[in-house]
Amino acid sequence: MTLDVGPEDELPDWAAAKEFYQKYDPKDVIGRGVSSVVRRCVHRATGQEFAVKIMEVTAERLSPEQLEEVREATRRETHILRQVAGHPHIITLIDSYESSSFMFLVFDLMRKGELFDYLTEKVALSEKETRSIMRSLLEAVSFLHNNNIVHRDLKPENILLDDNMQIRLSDFGFSCHLEPGEKLRELCGTPGYLAPEILKCSMDETHPGYGKEVDLWACGVILFTLLAGSPPFWHRRQILMLRMIMEGQYQFSSPEWDDRSDTVKDLISRLLQVDPVERLTAEQALQHPFFERCEGSQAWNLTPRQRFRVAVWTVLAAGRVALSAHRIRPLTKSALLRDPYALRPVRRLIDNCAFRLYGHWVKKGEQQNRAALFQHRPPGPFPMMGPEEEGDSATIAEDEAMLVLG
């Protein structure tokens, strides 16, 4: 998807990026980050298309400390990407360039864009589609953890889709190496996907820190979000949302969960364990019954007569199923007036009509808020959490000012 070009998207001049321009021809803008622009680019020798992430590192925009921080983070990201190169579900780093004013990272071009945009279009995904996505994601996370790498920013925006709708994990800006037994204390990530131990660590100096388990919590949030179309943890007052995360307060209350299996709900509950020790690892999650599939049984050695009998019985059975499907139980007026949304055919009719009028912003339950998917803020400090209090708009504004997160 091509984006409109603004003043901040101007290309570096030839002198500042000579080495990059000699090999690649930059094209349209396809994405933006906090301090970067992503463009489609074409390899001059082969004509092959790639995506280039361009980061400006100049004193005009950043302080000396920020400049060094961005450079160090990009070098760390480059090192990790080269270490995990070759995994089918992790984005491939093709080239990297660094000048005095700009840094360039060239990746495979993922034409289908972000999983976030796909989810926004679809509203919610089926269990079958979710199973495929989550299996690939957990395989990538397992590979990272086996190489002592923690991602720390797993979310649908950082999961890309290729032409075959296969996922690639991207954006390793917060990733780092973590030796066995080592703990982290740095506050980073996106509010709705932060694990409880990250929040507790930022508020309690005596907290031991967090480890690779934070990635599995984020996987649980992603799994919930794909199936429900909205995140598990949300409140209009962010301080209460953070408390919900730390206490693991979420519900399968929206109508979408009426048609979801108990198996996937069990997997979510095992990933969204507040205690990281009780949380599933990536390998354990991949062994969960949700990912089991029926393997094709061996072909029967049937005679032609037996094959004919099987075909006849199949046709007869299909006919009976078709007849039974048309025998709809009568709908009484009292049942319709009592709770029309509880009746699946009526519910689908209501949803379809509402969707045509209001698009993706149809709220189907008190706990559902699709707008929360779009609420991302820059990193900031956490306050100490006191008893819950009901407040007026001034109190709410104060809470939000104190709880500015990324």
UniProtKB/Swiss-Prot annotation:
The lineage of its organism: Eukaryota, Metazoa, Chordata, Craniata, Vertebrata. This is Phosphorylase b kinase gamma catalytic chain, liver/testis isoform. Catalytic subunit of the phosphorylase b kinase (PHK), which mediates the neural and hormonal regulation of glycogen breakdown (glycogenolysis) by phosphorylating and thereby activating glycogen phosphorylase. May regulate glycogeneolysis in the testis. In vitro, phosphorylates PYGM. It catalyses: 2 ATP + phosphorylase b = 2 ADP + phosphorylase a. SUPFAM superfamilies: Protein kinase-like (PK-like). Residues 346-370 are annotated as: Calmodulin-binding (domain-C). One of its GO terms (cellular component) is cytoplasm. Belongs to the protein kinase superfamily. CAMK Ser/Thr protein kinase family.
